[in-house]
């Protein structure tokens, strides 16, 4: 029996004199020293134990009991533990908290071990190296990324390598920049890739804010050696050159890949058989979307952050039946390709799917398909469980039906993408035959429980199972014979796990027991015996059961190894299934909501007829559709109108329709014609960055600067209320200058919403700008928003009416109306502010001052205080007499 007890005092960390510890604690401390930065889960029988500082940390994070056992240097050895069969739920919680865990397993036999059972860390679990379905989010990836940079003179080359352990997708990217732009450029790529864990050279001092959102892990600088990285890639991909991947000259990225592969292999404790291909991404491959744009357009998260109950573009479109399809849809939304041919191929496939009734059959069949992609990865890593293989079997059995449906859709249709998918869904007969013969129809959850290998697959296993399963009949026969032989009618032959097989006789009948009965256990009312015959059968039956489990484990491992030979085929099938599922989901949505196929052209234009916001239209009864036209003659639309009139919704819908067109989806419009787009920028909303020490206006200007420095003539820019975070004249001057820069210098397609009515004069001096407004109708003191975009500027903002709708007290509204009248009367007076944008002081006419300073009379105030809708007949009569009295007093003055 192993013990944590220490016969001599020790420290809580490895001491210089290890002999002061028990042999087991010496083993623990040695293994812990090899994994100092991880929580070491140390297997002891049916529990994983943690000790010392790890125990304190685990107790705090997991809410498990912290106890103590033995002592070290006069201090108790702190410990905590979790049951091995429930460890996944604890691992999941720790990983979500950004922790890494080393699983130290018993690999020796406790029955034959002299001293501590041999143990070894078989796997290290980190946020970026997960493959278990219980630890991963179903609909998103959690990639591991390595970053390496080199500097030559003033040029910085940044290499990125990232791996999705759960899918086996390995990607590289490299770009050059200068010191001033390096941080911004890197941040943009990290926001796009969204790694769960970032590997950094140890020479980097502390976490950089650009990648602090992920778990940062430092590894020795020499892990990033370029020569080693090149060799590692050649060995992993089984190639003699990287030229075919376009990666031969990406030295910084190759160095990052070397560190990445070394780390990933170390955490898994084995090779990465499922990493079989390499993709090189380039700077200009995707439509650029920074974090602000992804957030403002609410692609996969709402503006308020992660909220599973709120509507996003992803949640709207995710009709996918498989987790693979959902992950691919999410990827498409964040990685819209600039290449119009890619989107056109998807448009053609969706159109073909919509032309037949096959969508319903495809959807129902896909619903029976498991996560083939992640199961294939676990097969390659030899960590797949029996029910994974049963799921794979069920998924592969659906391939003929899916191919038939795809063929039906592709008849008389020009959809090459569907043809590619059809060909990839060919059934791997050898692989399917193996799993159908080998795995039971309803296997146990774990191999150790038995009942995993199907009957008839292995003769030796069937024989061993027969010995174990026939035990019941043998015991019945033995019980009958012994009752006859002894004359004891209530004699019973039974079995339990503690004492094995036995014959039970009540105390009143023990005098009839034959001489060959040997007492095994005494109970209060009975005696339990064993006979030579029963003992011989026990040895044979129990041995058969143990040997059957061992044989089953051996056979299962053999099946996994044979299945691993088909990983490449299974990965191709998984990718085809994901594409098909995503296209079917988009086709279903387009059919249900009357979306149209967009036209992608080479000329610069965004021409949308009767466009609608895809998410908003799904949540209101009637949505007002609007047009949008941007081209060489009209580069900027200046949008005015009331608060809540729909300006932001209109701007977002134009951006979403544009993005969806390049994603390859149909779009919510009557028609949409869109030219080349390289980036989409948004400057929407107002929020400060308290943690970063930035005010609302600083955030606004930082985002505006990123747009002005990064936008091109092929960019779509959304600017909402620029300049509102500072004084009126400062804000107006900045808004005017920014709008002019976007027209004159960048020539981006721009939607510019503002409440500065002075900006509506911009089209008079810039013909490529045009005024549009969101219309509204005022009725008495209320307002009705029409949400229709019309030509020309708005007449007013209706701010007080909106405040009234929001429930601002009537007294405040009345006071605001009075002050508004004063401000409007004083609108020609120059504001005494002094800054870079202020005009010289102007003389203020005395008459204007007198007008502005005039105070309303008591009669005016009394009249303004009256709310006719709130007066009873008697109150109205009293008010009328009061007004009459004030009027007479005013005339007397």
From Swiss-Prot:
GO MF terms held by the record: ATP binding; ATP-dependent DNA damage sensor activity; damaged DNA binding; mismatched DNA binding
Composition bias type Low complexity, residue spans: 1-17
Record keywords: ATP-binding, DNA damage, DNA repair, DNA-binding, Nucleotide-binding
Database matches in CDD domains: ABC_MutS1
InterPro entries hit by this protein: DNA_mismatch_repair_MutS, DNA_mismatch_repair_MutS-lik_N, DNA_mismatch_repair_MutS/MSH, DNA_mismatch_repair_MutS_C, DNA_mismatch_repair_MutS_clamp, DNA_mismatch_repair_MutS_core, DNA_mismatch_repair_MutS_N, DNA_mismatch_repair_MutS_sf
Record has Cell division as a keyword: no
Domain of life of the native organism: Bacteria
Residues that, per the record, bind ATP: 641-648
CC terms in the record's Gene Ontology section: cytosol
Disordered, as annotated region: 1-22
Pfam family, one: MutS_II
Transmembrane segments: none
PANTHER family in the record: DNA MISMATCH REPAIR PROTEIN MSH1, MITOCHONDRIAL, DNA MISMATCH REPAIR PROTEIN MUTS FAMILY MEMBER
Annotated function: This protein is involved in the repair of mismatches in DNA. It is possible that it carries out the mismatch recognition step. This protein has a weak ATPase activity.
UniProt family annotation: Belongs to the DNA mismatch repair MutS family.
Protein name: DNA mismatch repair protein MutS
Organism of this sequence: Herminiimonas arsenicoxydans
Gene: mutS
